[in-house]
Amino acid sequence: MKNIILLSLFVIVSCTMAFSANPPEVVLAAFKQKFPNAQDVDWSKEKNGEWEAEFEMPGSNEMSANFSADGRWLETETEIAFSELPAPVIAALQGKKVKEAARIEKADGSTVYEAEVKRKDLIFDASGKML
């Protein structure tokens, strides 16, 4: 019985720690500089070591931004309506049920588009080519 209680406490503490993500100061500073008006920010650490902030900006849809551990901005994803996807992307998705769509701006200046179809994220360039 004592072992079960100890195991239960360990699991609870482990789960709590897994969901409470505190990025390094350099990441927080980079985020605040890029998104000074961000609200309702929730941080998580991804498997690849990147830090992801999910947040809202006044007058915008839901957003997320990824940063490297040293504070470099990597990309920003903004939720958009299906109708806001470029026409070639919409054509490439014809006949598919799209649950969510997003525009992803990359640090190299490129923009790609994401469409969630059957629990999978499909990525396209503006010409409708799947990447």
PLM region spans:
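Amphipathic N-proximal alpha-helical interface segments
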Residues: A53-E77, K120-L131
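Short, glycine/charged-rich beta-strand-loop motifs at protein surfaces that mediate ligand recognition
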Residues: M17, T76-E79
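Conserved histidines in hydrophobic membrane contexts and catalytic metal-binding motifs
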Residues: A53-E54, K106, T111-D121
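Short, non-transmembrane alpha-helical segments in secretory-pathway proteins
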Residues: A21-D40, A81-A101
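Hydrophobic/anchoring residues in structured secondary elements
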Residues: W43-K45, T78, R103-K106
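Flexible "stalk/tail and boundary" regions
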Residues: I90, G95, K99-Y113, A126-L131
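N-terminal targeting signals for Sec/Tat export/insertion, comprising classic cleavable signal peptides
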Residues: A29-E62
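Bacterial Sec-dependent N-terminal signal peptides
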Residues: M1-P23
